[in-house]
From Swiss-Prot:
Major subcellular site: cytoplasm
Source species, domain of life: Eukaryota
Modified residues (N-acetylalanine): 2
Species in which this protein is naturally found: Rattus norvegicus
Biological process terms in GO annotation: apoptotic process; endocytosis; Golgi to plasma membrane transport; protein localization to ciliary membrane; protein transport; regulation of postsynaptic neurotransmitter receptor internalization; vesicle-mediated transport
Gene Ontology molecular-function annotations: growth factor activity; GTPase activator activity; protein domain specific binding; protein homodimerization activity
InterPro entries documented for this protein: Rabaptin, Rabaptin_coiled-coil, Rabaptin_Rab5-bd_dom
Family: Belongs to the rabaptin family.
Phosphothreonine sites (modified residues): 408
Assembly with partners or alone: Heterodimer with RABGEF1. The heterodimer binds RAB4A and RAB5A that have been activated by GTP-binding. Interacts with TSC2. Interacts with GGA1 (via GAE domain), GGA2 (via GAE domain) and GGA3 (via GAE domain). Interacts with AP1G1 (via GAE domain). Interacts with AP1G2 (via GAE domain). Interacts with ECPAS. Interacts with KCNH1. Interacts with PKD1 (via C-terminal domain) and GGA1; the interactions recruit PKD1:PKD2 complex to GGA1 and ARL3 at trans-Golgi network. Interacts with KCNH1.
List of residues that carry Phosphoserine: 374, 377, 407, 410
Location of the protein in the cell: Cytoplasm; Early endosome; Recycling endosome; Cytoplasmic vesicle
Protein name per its UniProtKB record: Rab GTPase-binding effector protein 1
Length: 862
């Protein structure tokens, strides 16, 4: 009972402690709120300052970027101006060099011509003086002789007088002497007058010589001026001649290439001749093999057929013969009309010789003879089958159909025409699946179905003296798939016949379906045998293509002749372009003067831009210095604000210690009960946890803010350093550019001085260019050379025409070879048909002996 008394004391102390803690907490919260408000205010100020600084930096960067763009633009303009100046310098140097060379050349030619003219004038004056001196000497000699004769007469008279003649005679002699003196005086006076007149004439002649010399000099000067004026025309004329010469040379090269191609075509044509011979050989072998297979199949079918079937075959044969006779009569009338209108057309083979080596015609003839010999040798390698003889009318109809087939453009005919015209009904089953390319051109030209007599099929044998080649024996011995099918069919039929009983006469050994199938296959084989030969049609197309190429070459020759005429017309039209060329030269001079004035204006504009660039650079420098001052001031403000924040933090720590001391000094009433104390303690603990979390959060927040401010200060410091470096670089670059601009300005002034000098020299050169047209003689020589070149080109064209004529003759020879080849093929077809129609081996031997030919001209006309 004594223990519950003192229990309320700890509760009161706890309550007091709790109250103190609540007060401390309230004070701490108030201080925290105040600090947050102050921090937010300061943060807003810092944000405003930061945004203001960012805007200032953006403006400064924009100004710097604009200044850099202006600098780049000005640099590009300066580079362009420098490039243009370099181009102008190069053009001026080139023009000066060319003008100086032209002036030197013209001076040299002028000096040569003046020296030649002076020499000519001196020679003419010397000739005139020499002639006059000769005349004067001759006249003086004549007068001296006359005076000597007169003096001799006077001396004789005086001697006579001195000899003491009689006085009478003396008077007479004196009279005679006076008369002679008068006569002499009458002769001498006109002679003196004539001498004076001759002297006057001599002076006049000398004056005329001087006048003629002066007039000749004037004429020569006028001639030189005219030559100067004609220089541009002659230059253009020579340029046109050079272009025409190049065009003619290109045409000649094209002709050479075309001739080379044509020669290549000739070589290909020769190769095709050899290939065609082998093709005919193979076609004959294939044709013989197909004929042999037809004979064997017909013999086997004869064994299979019954007497009833043979009778039906005979009836069908008679009907077909009657129809064929009627059609033959009708077609004979039509063919007579057609033969009068149409002629045999054989495509011309275009074969041209090589350009470099002109092969003689004798070599071609030898080649053709060898070709003929190789074609004739085909007769010795042919193995011809023998069949039942045709009637005489069938043989004539075959020749008529063959002649009509030759009148067309191809060597083959349709199977329906010849099968109806010749009256062949039976087809071999073994050839039912063969293509038309397996028979060659002979089958195409002789595509007819065989009409063998069923009685004599088994009695045919090969002639004893007719030998086969190895290829023919191999082709005969080898079995084709069609032969194997036929053999299997016959073996099945013969086995059926052996196993079955012997049927009475009149009954079939095969069924109706097999019989119909056999007739269809025989009909198909005959149709395929009569198809057109693809090889012949391809060969005909090749011949037509070669003929077209020949026509094209002729057209090209005509075009070249037309081009020559046009070139001559163009040569005549060149003199009409004189005024246009003068206008062009005048316009080019005006354009050059305009370009020079435009360059002067651009140089002045570049100077103005340089001054503007200097002003903008000085303005940018002042702006950068002002920005640097503003940045320094803002840095000082930030440092002052940091010092103030440190002081505030110190003051806050002092207030915290003051509040703690105040809470300790206050009275704290503890709670009365343990339950209340426990609740109060729990409440305080929760408040302490909240306060600690808030303090930690505030501490972290303040640390983050401090770090942010430090990083911001460092970034501003780095930005400031970078800005200082960039500005320093820009200042150095601007200094360099100013130095380069000053050097460019000096260069521009020097170029202006050079421009003035060039203008003065240009005026001098323009004055001197008026004397550059004194080279007509050289141009005339060039014209003569061009005319000589034209003559050589015409000679070359004449040679090309001769080559074309020679190639035409060779083309005719090759065409004749083709005709002979076709004639030989037709003869072979006729011989094959005769052998096919032969009724005995003796007849076949006689036909083979008759075919021994030594020349193509011995072939009969078909």
């Amino acid at each position: 009972m004594a223990q519950p008394g003192p229990a309320p004391q700890p509760d009161v102390s706890l309550q007091q402690r709790v109250a103190e803690l609540e007060k401390i907490n309230a004070e701490f919260l108030r201080a925290q709120q105040q600090l947050e408000q102050e921090f937010n205010q300061k943060r807003a100020k810092f944000k405003e300052l930061y945004l203001a600084k960012e805007e200032d930096l953006k403006r400064q960067n924009a100004v710097l970027q604009a200044a850099q763009d202006d600098l780049g633009h000005l640099r590009t303009q300066l580079w362009e101006a420098q490039a243009e100046m370099e181009n102008i310098k190069a053009i001026a140097t080139v023009s000066e060099n060319t003008k100086q060379e032209a002036i030197d050349e013209v001076k040299r030619q002028w000096r040569e011509e003046v020296a030649s003219l002076q020499a000519v004038m001196k020679e003419t004056v010397r000739d005139y003086e020499h002639q006059f001196h000769l005349r004067l000497e001759q006249e003086r000699a004549q007068w001296a002789q006359y005076r000597e004769s007169a003096d001799r007469e006077i001396a004789d008279l005086r001697r006579r007088l001195s000899e003491g003649q009689e006085e009478e005679n003396l008077e007479n002699e004196m009279k005679k002497a006076q008369e002679d003196a008068e006569k002499l005086r009458s002769v001498v006076m006109p002679m003196e007058k004539e001498i004076a007149a001759l002297k006057d004439k001599l002076t006049e002649a000398e004056d005329k010589i001087k006048e003629l010399e002066a007039s000749k000099v004037k004429e020569l000067n006028h001639y030189l001026e005219a030559e100067k004026s004609c220089r541009t025309d002659l230059e253009m004329y020579v340029a046109v001649l050079n272009t025409q010469k190049s065009v003619l040379q290109e045409d000649a090269e094209k002709l050479r290439k075309e001739l080379h191609e044509v020669c290549h075509l000739l070589e290909q044509e020769r190769q095709q001749h050899n290939q065609l011979k082998h093709t005919w050989q193979k076609a004959n072998d294939q044709f013989l093999e197909s004929q042999r297979l037809l004979m064997r199949d017909m013999q086997r079918m004869e064994i299979v057929l019954t007497s009833e079937q043979l009778r039906q075959v005979e009836e069908l044969k008679k009907k077909d013969q009657e129809e064929d006779e009627q059609q033959r009569i009708n077609k004979g009338k039509d063919n007579k009309k057609i033969d009068t209108e149409e002629e045999v057309k054989i495509p011309v083979v275009c074969a041209l010789t090589q350009e470099e080596s002109s092969t003689p015609l004798s070599n071609e003839e030898e080649h053709l003879d060898s070709t003929h010999g190789s074609v004739h040798s085909l007769d010795a390698d042919l193995l011809l089958p023998s069949g039942d003889p045709f009637s005489k009318s069938d043989n004539d109809m075959f020749k008529e159909g063959l002649r009509r087939a030759q009148s067309t453009d191809s060597l083959g005919t349709s199977s329906s025409l010849q099968s109806k015209a010749l009256g062949y009904n039976y087809k071999a089953k073994s050839a039912g699946n063969l293509d038309e390319s397996d028979f060659g051109p002979l089958v195409g030209a002789d595509s007819v179905s065989e009409n063998f007599d069923t009685v004599s099929l088994g009695s045919l044998q090969m002639p004893s003296g007719f030998m086969l080649t190895k290829d023919q024996e191999r082709a005969i011995k080898a079995m084709t798939p069609e032969q194997e099918e036929t053999a299997s069919l016959l073996s099945s039929v013969t086995q059926g016949m052996e196993s079955a009983y012997v049927s009475p006469s009149g009954y079939r050994l095969v069924s109706e379906t097999e019989w119909n199938l056999l007739q269809k296959e025989v009909h198909n084989a005959g149709n395929k045998l009569g198809r057109r030969c693809d090889m012949c049609s391809n060969y005909e197309k090749q011949l037509q293509g070669i003929q077209i190429q020949e026509a094209e070459t002729r057209d090209q020759v005509k075009k070249l002749q037309l081009m020559l005429r046009q070139a001559n017309d163009q040569l005549e039209k060149t003199m009409k372009e004189k005024q246009e060329l003068e206008d062009f030269l005048r316009q080019s001079a005006e354009d050059s003067s305009h370009q020079i004035s435009a360059l002067v204006l651009r140089a002045q504009a570049s100077e103005v831009l340089l001054e503007e660039l200097q002003q903008s650079f000085s303005q940018a420098k002042r702006d950068v210095q002002e920005q640097m001052a503003v940045l320094m001031q803002s840095r000082e403000q930030v440092s002052e604000e940091l010092v103030r924040l440190q002081k505030d933090n110190d003051s806050l720590q002092g207030k915290h210690s003051l509040h703690v001391s105040l809470q300790l000094a206050e009275d704290f009433i503890l709670p009365d009960t343990v339950q209340v104390l426990r609740e109060l303690v729990l409440k305080y603990r929760e408040n302490i946890v909240h306060v600690r979390t808030a303090a930690d959060h505030m501490e972290e927040k303040l640390k983050a803010e401090i770090l942010f401010l430090k990083e911001q200060i460092q970034a501003e410091q780095c930005l400031k350093e970078n800005l200082e470096e960039t500005l320093q670089l820009e200042i150095e670059n601007c200094k360099e550019e100013i130095a380069s601009i000053s050097s460019l300005k000096a260069e521009l002034e020097r170029i202006k001085v050079e421009k003035g000098q060039l203008e003065s020299t240009l005026r001098e050169k323009s004055q001197q260019l008026e004397s550059l047209q004194e080279i007509k003689v050289n141009l005339e020589e060039q014209l003569k050379k061009e005319t000589a070149a034209k003559a050589t080109v015409e000679q070359l064209m004449f040679e090309e025409k001769n080559k074309a004529q020679r190639l035409q003759t060779e083309l005719d020879v090759s065409e004749q070879v083709q005709r002979d080849f076709v004639k030989l093929s037709q003869t072979l077809q006729v011989q094959l048909e005769r052998i096919r129609q032969a009724d005995s081996l003796e007849r076949i031997r006689a036909i083979l002996n008759d075919t021994k030919l030594t020349d193509i001209n011995q072939l009969p006309e078909t």
